[in-house]
């Protein structure tokens, strides 16, 4: 019988596209975060530039001066693409629904993509810019970063879908505070909720006659409201 390390060594000899799928299955088994090399193979089409290597402290200083938003993954930085009009409409609808729901549920707050989320685990340091975060831990909030989200939502796009579904899911679930990870489609009326309580098994809500359940914050949103004013595609 081969050890896990021996299997990993053999997998590294596979073509990139095959290796991605097999390593994703292995990470599901041992719960490890996504490897740096794997991230950099998936990111170029999304970032549009070669990753630069720097410390997290250097990244923090760089980000304060940059007019663009970036994400930081274990020393590599990646520029973020701008959102579409449909993306903005969906996020406005989601923000409005959650903000109204949480107004009397302090200390929970909802934050948009301008706020970064820091993940630290052993030797890994990651800073993401989720589209939406619900945070109920006022005691761990920083001026610029959040650390203990209760819910994270991302609106999918062709350039980010692979990253949101694979890399970010694997890294987000390392956060003990996270209860739900929500993926919202722009191309169809479809929302996928990945709940910790169900071992991250996705719940799928599709069609304007359905409503998405965000059980972590006790909120149900009809998809017809989430996609209000979205006239295409």
What do these predicted ranges mean?
Residues 2-10, 17-233:
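Gly/Pro/Ser/Thr-rich low-complexity, intrinsically disordered segments predominantly at protein N-termini
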């Amino acid at each position: 019988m081969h050890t896990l390390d021996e299997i990993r060594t053999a997998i590294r000899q596979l073509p990139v596209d095959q290796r991605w799928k097999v390593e994703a299955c292995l990470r599901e088994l041992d719960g490890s975060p996504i490897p740096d090399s794997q991230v950099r193979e998936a990111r170029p089409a999304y970032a549009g530039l070669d990753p630069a290597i720097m410390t997290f402290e250097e990244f923090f200083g760089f980000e304060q001066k940059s007019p663009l938003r970036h994400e930081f993954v274990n020393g590599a930085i990646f520029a973020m693409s701008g959102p579409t009009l449909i993306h903005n409409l969906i996020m406005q609808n989601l923000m409005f629904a959650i903000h109204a729901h949480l107004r009397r549920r302090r200390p929970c707050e909802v934050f948009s993509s301008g706020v970064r989320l820091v993940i630290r685990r052993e030797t890994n340091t990651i800073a993401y810019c989720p589209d939406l975060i619900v945070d109920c831990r006022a005691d761990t909030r920083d001026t610029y970063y959040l650390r203990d989200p209760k819910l994270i939502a991302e609106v999918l796009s062709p350039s980010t879908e692979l990253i949101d579904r694979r890399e970010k899911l694997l890294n987000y679930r390392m956060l003990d505070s996270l209860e739900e990870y929500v993926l919202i489609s722009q191309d169809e009326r479809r929302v996928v909720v990945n709940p910790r309580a169900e071992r991250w098994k996705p719940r799928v809500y599709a069609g304007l006659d359905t409503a998405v359940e965000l059980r972590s914050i006790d909120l149900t949103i009809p998809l017809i409201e989430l996609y209000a004013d979205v006239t295409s595609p």
